[in-house]
């Protein structure tokens, strides 16, 4: 812009640095007073500042009109008084812009504080005024917003028995050397009675549950109030089987020193190794040692190494369970007890033998399993001279009018399946048996008249045949 202005020359009516105002054509310089010239210069400066700062410029007149025209072109006064443009105005504007850019680039991030401040669990009525003040509320809000709620984890062993800590303290005091990191006790500020969980912020507690305590800003609130906690259980209570072996393994893995194993032997004896005790506890005289659990009987295969070692639930399952005692009856009822019959139990325990029906006739014997299908106490009729068309259904339909009718069967050849011309009919009632013999003898069943006889199936049994032979021998018939 300056080069363009320098090449074109000063515009009429604009001030030149270090020189007078160039008047426009037709304007007489001697006719203007000093106040009018000052107003024209201020108007031109305002237009020039707008052009430099990038504001829209309506346009610069080529000639400066008379006094009324100058009053019409005046810009309304700005609320902030602007300095007069000098030769170093451009440099000042550049420095201001650079300072703003540097300030925007170097924005201070939110400050991250240290560990969160844990206030006292309870506070008195005198401290409520401090918490209700706006400064305390703002500080508490900023602390909750900026500080993470979780505390950094402390690197320490997961579990160190009390006996090992006592033995280690006695060993380090006697030897004068530092403790191993794995057996060092935690910081004293972290040692205290076991709590169910981390306490919440003091503002979340009800007003009646807050106990009087030190002021909010005091550092004494970091430690919990001193109370008399319950005595911790001595080492060896509830730790299960193989307690001494576990102590030796923990000491050997943590310290790796021979003195630590000696300290375990001292601590396992039951006497305290030194005055240093982590946490409050009762004296050893008040602690009642529990009896050691009885060793469980192990199977012979596990002892010989044939099977892998069993776990604790499996060992507990091997312990013989005591049987519940049987209720004893009163002494007066002892004589009324009846012993259970042993014969019935023996009969029930043995499987029933399958009956075998052995028949004998014409000097030969054979087994007939078809006789097992019939009732042994029935009254059976032999039916002869049956036609080839007669089957079990036809024979049963002919004798089914009798109330005690049981079964009817036609005997067939096993190889060909053809009928042999005879069959059997059984009844439960002997009266029906007699009626059937009288009424059905000679009647047509199928295409032929039926012939009925008394069945002799019992006479063909081997037992009956032998019995008859013995009777005949006694009578001297044969």
From Swiss-Prot:
| GO cellular component terms, A-Z | cytoplasm; U4/U6 x U5 tri-snRNP complex
Instruction: Output the superkingdom of the source species.
Output: Eukaryota
Q: Which residues form a coiled coil?
A: none
Q: Which residues carry this modification: Phosphoserine?
A: 133
Q: Which UniProt keyword terms apply here?
A: Acetylation, Cytoplasm, Methylation, Nucleus, Phosphoprotein, RNA-binding
Q: Where is the composition biased (Pro residues)?
A: 193-205
Q: Where is the composition biased (Basic and acidic residues)?
A: 343-354
Pfam annotation, one family:
RRM_1
Localization annotation: Nucleus; Cytoplasm
> Per its UniProt record, what CDD domains does this chain match?
RRM_RBM42
Q: What residues does the RRM domain cover?
A: 379-457
N-acetylalanine carried by residues: 2
One Gene Ontology term of the molecular function aspect: mRNA binding
Q: Matching InterPro entries, A to Z?
A: Nucleotide-bd_a/b_plait_sf, RBD_domain_sf, RBM42_RBP45_47-like, RBM42_RRM, RRM_dom
Coarse class of the protein's main subcellular location? nucleus
Which residues lie in Low complexity bias regions? 1-20
Q: Extract the ranges annotated as region (Disordered).
A: 1-33, 171-207, 317-354
Give the family per the record: Belongs to the RRM RBM42 family.
**Quaternary form?**
Interacts with HNRNPK.
The protein in question is named RNA-binding protein 42
Q: What is the organism of origin for this protein?
A: Mus musculus
Gene for this chain: Rbm42
């Amino acid at each position: 812009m300056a080069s363009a202005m320098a090449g074109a020359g000063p515009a009429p009516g604009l001030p030149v640095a270090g020189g007078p105002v160039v008047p426009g054509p037709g304007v007489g310089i001697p006719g203007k007073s000093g106040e009018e010239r000052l107003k024209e210069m201020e108007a031109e400066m305002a237009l020039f500042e707008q052009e430099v700062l990038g504001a829209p410029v309506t346009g610069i007149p080529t000639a400066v009109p008379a006094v009324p025209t100058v009053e019409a072109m005046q810009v309304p006064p700005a609320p902030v008084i602007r300095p007069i443009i000098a030769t170093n105005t451009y440099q000042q504007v550049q420095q201001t812009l650079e300072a703003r850019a540097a300030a925007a680039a170097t924005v201070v991030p939110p400050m991250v504080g240290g560990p969160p401040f844990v206030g006292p669990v309870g506070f008195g009525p005198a401290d409520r005024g401090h918490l209700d003040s706006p400064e305390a509320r703002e500080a508490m809000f900023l602390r909750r917003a900026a500080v993470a709620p979780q505390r950094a984890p402390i690197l320490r062993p997961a579990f160190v028995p009390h006996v090992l800590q006592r033995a280690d303290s006695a060993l380090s005091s006697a030897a004068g050397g530092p403790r191993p990191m794995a057996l060092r006790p935690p910081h004293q500020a972290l040692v205290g009675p076991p709590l169910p969980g981390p306490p919440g912020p003091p503002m979340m507690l009800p007003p009646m549950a807050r106990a009087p305590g030190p002021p909010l800003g005091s550092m004494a609130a970091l430690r919990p109030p001193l109370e008399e906690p319950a005595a911790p259980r001595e080492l060896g209570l509830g730790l299960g089987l193989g307690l001494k072996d576990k102590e030796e393994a923990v000491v050997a893995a943590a310290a790796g020193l021979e003195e630590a194993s000696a300290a375990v032997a001292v601590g396992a004896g039951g006497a305290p190794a030194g005055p240093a005790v982590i946490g409050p506890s009762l004296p050893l005289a008040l602690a009642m040692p529990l009896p050691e659990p009885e060793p469980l009987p192990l199977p012979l295969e596990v002892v010989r190494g044939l099977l892998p070692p069993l776990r604790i639930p499996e060992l507990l399952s091997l312990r013989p369970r005591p049987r519940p005692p049987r209720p004893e009856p009163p002494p007066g009822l002892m004589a009324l007890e009846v012993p259970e019959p042993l014969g019935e139990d023996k009969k029930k325990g043995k499987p029933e033998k399958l009956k075998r029906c052995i028949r004998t006739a014409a000097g030969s014997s054979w087994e007939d399993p078809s006789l097992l299908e019939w009732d042994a106490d029935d009254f059976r009729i032999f039916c002869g001279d049956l036609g080839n068309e007669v089957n079990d259904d036809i024979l049963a339909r002919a004798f089914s009018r009798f109330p005690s009718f049981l079964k009817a069967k036609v005997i067939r050849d096993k190889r060909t399946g053809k009928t042999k011309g005879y069959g059997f009919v059984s009844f439960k009632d002997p009266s029906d048996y007699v009626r059937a013999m009288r009424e059905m003898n000679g009647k047509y069943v199928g295409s032929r008249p039926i012939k009925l006889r008394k069945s002799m199936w019992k006479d063909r049994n081997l037992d009956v045949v032998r019995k008859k032979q013995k009777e005949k021998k006694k009578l001297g018939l044969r």
